[in-house]
């Protein structure tokens, strides 16, 4: 998303893994990520230059989000849309509208919520669509797979950046995902 906008600052809510860009939120205070699944994550080894690049807000919390709205040059908002609690649809609509107005990329991290309640992501249930979407876990029915989906114009631009993986040639996850999708569709699992 930074490739697309040319801006570097990212706002997040939810848990998004152990990457430097995520842990950078705790450089100022190791409590910034406390309400995002795991408490007390240390930012040891994370470059201090990332200090003012990641900002946190809590899901469904308008007061937190007001602070995000004041950040200059925001590139992206990454949200874990649902974990324990359902999202507030009014909150999601507000975030979507804010992103549209300010040309900010909205990414839904649905690694844990995708294919739990709907065919696809939980965003389908609420009819609030991100610019990019990350799916995993249930997509492969236990096999390792993650997919990044998005608007064609964004994916085309993002393809200019380098993304790789140790297991990028491993195809069991892809095969499992295709079969999982086929079975979900064939058995109409989400129509019952």
How would you describe each model-predicted region?
Residues 1-192:
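Conserved N-terminal phosphate-binding loop of PLP-dependent enzymes in the Aspartate aminotransferase
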């Amino acid at each position: 998303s930074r490739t697309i906008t040319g801006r570097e600052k990212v706002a997040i809510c939810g848990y998004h893994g152990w990457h430097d860009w995520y842990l950078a939120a705790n450089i100022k205070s190791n409590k910034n990520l406390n309400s995002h699944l795991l408490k007390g994550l240390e930012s040891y080894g994370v470059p201090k230059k990332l200090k003012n690049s990641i900002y946190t807000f809590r899901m469904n919390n308008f007061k937190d989000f007001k602070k995000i709205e004041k950040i200059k040059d925001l590139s992206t908002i990454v949200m874990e849309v649902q974990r324990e609690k359902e999202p507030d649809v009014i909150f999601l609509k507000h975030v979507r509208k804010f992103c549209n107005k300010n040309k900010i990329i909205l990414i839904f991290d649905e690694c844990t919520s995708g294919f739990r309640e709907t065919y696809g992501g939980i965003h389908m249930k609420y009819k609030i669509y991100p610019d990019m979407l990350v799916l995993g876990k249930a997509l492969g029915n236990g096999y390792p797979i993650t997919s990044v989906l998005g608007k064609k114009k964004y994916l085309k631009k993002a393809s200019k950046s380098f993304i790789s993986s140790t297991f990028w040639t491993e195809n069991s996850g892809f095969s499992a995902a295709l079969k999982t999708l086929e079975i979900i569709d064939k058995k109409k699992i989400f129509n019952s």
